Amino acid sequence: MKMNLPPFIEIYRALIATPSISATEEALDQSNESLINMLAGWFSDLGFKVEVQPVPGTRHKFNLLASAGQGAGGLLLAGHTDTVPFDDGRWTRDPFTLTEHDGKLYGLGTADMKGFFAFILDALRDVDVKTLKKPLYILATADEETSMAGARYFSENTAIRPDCAIIGEPTSLQPIRAHKGHISTAVRVLGQSGHSSDPARGVNAIELMHDAIGRIMVLRDSLKERFHHDSFTVPYPTLNLGSLHGGDASNRICACCELHMDIRPLPGMTLDDLNGLLSEALAPVSERWPGRLTIFDLHPPIPGYECPPDHQLVQVVEKLLGEKTDVVNYCTEAPFIQTLCPTLVLGPGSINQAHQPDEYLETRFIKPTRELITQVVHHFCWH
């Protein structure tokens, strides 16, 4: 059956040629069903048991879990099947045609992160999965680039409990054991419109928001003072005011003002605690103006994540690569996979190429990535 598996570069080419864009805008959003079915066929050919899982609340999106081996524990290799949209005017190549030039493989998803599945398949093409002493799981998720709905749903509903997991996001083969979370929040203030010549006849939402922002700034300073993690370049939780919209004319009392902000919590900080701190900070405004201030999530929140530095997975990967683990500020699906088992983020390609025009993966990553996958599978599934 394995004779049917295409060569590495042809697997890569087929993955890139199969669009699977995730977007909040419905017109741009695409199902990943074709890509999932393609992966399902290849992993079946390698002897894996394949399960395709519809993801509720999405526009026809699916997860795939391929399983081989018996017993408990083992290794999970995970990644997402979707990409971000692309700006056609800024690409100099067809995003859906894998193009090799000057030591680089170009295409949408080459680095972030369809290519990781080509590496897994290629590393396993000569493996008899019936000889595994522990389970090997391959997880392909949906909607990482928007809501992370695939990883959320999988982690909440699966019964598998591997010994450890590796998520193949582009880290330039630098193992990552921790990252901050992300909370994207809106604060909306409702006033009462009126003619600006008589301010007493209205309630100016901008003035109420001014009060609210002042209290949010106090919270920002408090977070910086109270929470610290020396491993991060920015060692405290950040709070950013991203956009502010309110009013429609200079001679009208503003009836509505809305602030969009984000908080990037450190590992170990709970989302409930942070939401509580924000509500507490804005309580004086709410009490003075009942019913006029609301707080809501713009996107599903992502907690911070950290793999224990003394875990066997960290020690094994550091020894194999000769590289110490690091931490980053961007987010991945690791917080959700970490609820199942200790997790590292580690994969080929550079994060600097993710979400960029003419995205590429350097061919220098091909050999070491194939070797790394072979080694970790051997260590965690045959020992």
UniProtKB/Swiss-Prot annotation:
Positions binding Zn(2+) 2 in this chain are: 112, 145, 355
Question: Keyword Amino-acid biosynthesis on this protein?
Answer: yes
- Cofactor(s), by name: Zn(2+); Co(2+); glutathione
Pathway the protein acts in:
Amino-acid biosynthesis; L-arginine biosynthesis; L-ornithine from N(2)-acetyl-L-ornithine (linear): step 1/1
The residues the record assigns to binding Zn(2+) 1 are: 80, 112, 169
- GO CC terms of this entry: cytoplasm
Quaternary structure note = Homodimer.
PANTHER family attached here? Answer: ACETYLORNITHINE DEACETYLASE (PTHR43808:SF1)
Q: What is its EC number?
A: 3.5.1.16
- An example Gene Ontology biological process: L-arginine biosynthetic process
Checking CDD domains in the record gives: M20_ArgE
Query: Which compartment or compartments is the protein found in?
Result: Cytoplasm
Q: Which domain of life is it from?
A: Bacteria
Active-site residue list: 82, 144
Q: What is this protein called?
A: Acetylornithine deacetylase
Cross-referenced InterPro entries: AcOrn-deacetyl (IPR010169), ArgE/DapE_CS (IPR001261), Bact_exopeptidase_dim_dom (IPR036264), Peptidase_M20 (IPR002933), Peptidase_M20_dimer (IPR011650), Peptidase_M20A (IPR050072)
Q: Which reaction does it catalyse?
A: N(2)-acetyl-L-ornithine + H2O = L-ornithine + acetate
EC category: hydrolase
The record's HAMAP family line, in alphabetical order, gives: ArgE (MF_01108)
